[in-house]
């Protein structure tokens, strides 16, 4: 039973916010909210996640197609990813996550291009297999340097039952390069999370075995970065630290990743998983089949960076451990100067977080390094093990919520009165118009990187720039207005 005053207040807030719902909906939504308790090792049945959103409720979740094409496969730069279906899905999933990559777009890198079969009514009636085959032929003519192609199926393709696997097999033989079908129709599952899982299974079945039995020169220090999508250059900032401590990064995907890097991943000694939610499936598979250990790491803020570097180093020998300590020491002065500059300007500010993937827990340490307090955290599409991993980083009584509706989120903000909200593009303009400082934490509000020591300097600057912007003097939050 929660005795903490903050916890009691937040329990009462949950009941108050849910009062507007009919009884059935109220009971269902109550299962998706709790207050944190440091004594708990697992959320157990205190919070329920990865369930279908309530009909009629405005949810900010994405779909399975978004999880596969927009997250896992889209950033693989030397492959072309076909959005097989209406043109809109491909356009809205094109380049919105700012997955930085090296290369020449349209020549040897294709991540920002929208390849679509542009389904029309006649394709629904007569099927789109022939159109898809023709599309792949034209792509090979126009973009011959692609190393492979994925077919990301959208809702209509699944509804009419097109056989994209047959088209993929025939095209692969004709082109002598991988053409990979991904059955990620948006209506499948309850959120983009199933799309991650589907894409992981496709990587397992179509890519990871491609170089099995072939020679590959290894070292004792080979690692792979998995699940860093290089938003604003995050993976590059992380890779620097790993290489400075003496590790060899054999593969990095999906951000700035290539097909051959994915194929080489089974040769590494350790898989480093950044986004646990989207990539834990493939990491577990490689652990079972190839006996490759894996670990989640967190490179947000100097405290968590040092903690993660030491945990990574513990997987290797004394040389790497010594190197890790040297890397941490090398950046201590720089980090101390950043904290000395920005912490006095940010100390005590309250933050509400609502994001997907890993960020609601990973960014907590970075905010705390700047003296800021997390008063509420929520996930759009988490599973219960995500909440289990979040509990240790939250103070007692912190509000924790899952798949919040627009109404619930606004009600929490009005009651908790955060100084800053970190969430997504769908929420950004609502809260800015309410007069609440906001950071778009899915793509770093067109800034970044935020990972690594280099990223923390930018993170601290951006939080200060957002909270202490004089423009907020021209706006007043609703709860600060006089009656």
Swiss-Prot record:
NCBIfam families: N2-ase-Ialpha, nifD. It comes from Klebsiella pneumoniae. This molybdenum-iron protein is part of the nitrogenase complex that catalyzes the key enzymatic reactions in nitrogen fixation. [7Fe-Mo-9S-C-homocitryl] cluster binds at residues 275, 442. Binds 1 [8Fe-7S] cluster per heterodimer. Signal peptide: none annotated. PANTHER family: NITROGENASE MOLYBDENUM-IRON PROTEIN ALPHA CHAIN. It is an enzyme of class 1 (oxidoreductase). One of its GO terms (cellular component) is molybdenum-iron nitrogenase complex. It catalyses: N2 + 8 reduced [2Fe-2S]-[ferredoxin] + 16 ATP + 16 H2O = H2 + 8 oxidized [2Fe-2S]-[ferredoxin] + 2 NH4(+) + 16 ADP + 16 phosphate + 6 H(+). It comes from the Bacteria. One of its GO terms (molecular function) is ATP binding. [8Fe-7S] cluster binds at residues 63, 89, 155. Its cofactor is [8Fe-7S] cluster; [7Fe-Mo-9S-C-homocitryl] cluster. CDD domains: Nitrogenase_MoFe_alpha. This is Nitrogenase molybdenum-iron protein alpha chain. Its EC number is 1.18.6.1. The keyword Cell inner membrane does not apply. Belongs to the NifD/NifK/NifE/NifN family. One of its GO terms (biological process) is nitrogen fixation. Keywords: ATP-binding, Iron, Iron-sulfur, Metal-binding, Molybdenum, Nitrogen fixation, Nucleotide-binding, Oxidoreductase. InterPro entries: Nase/OxRdtase_comp1, Nase_comp1_asu, Nase_comp1_CS, Nase_Mo-Fe_asu. Tetramer of two alpha and two beta chains. Forms complex with the iron protein (nitrogenase component 2).
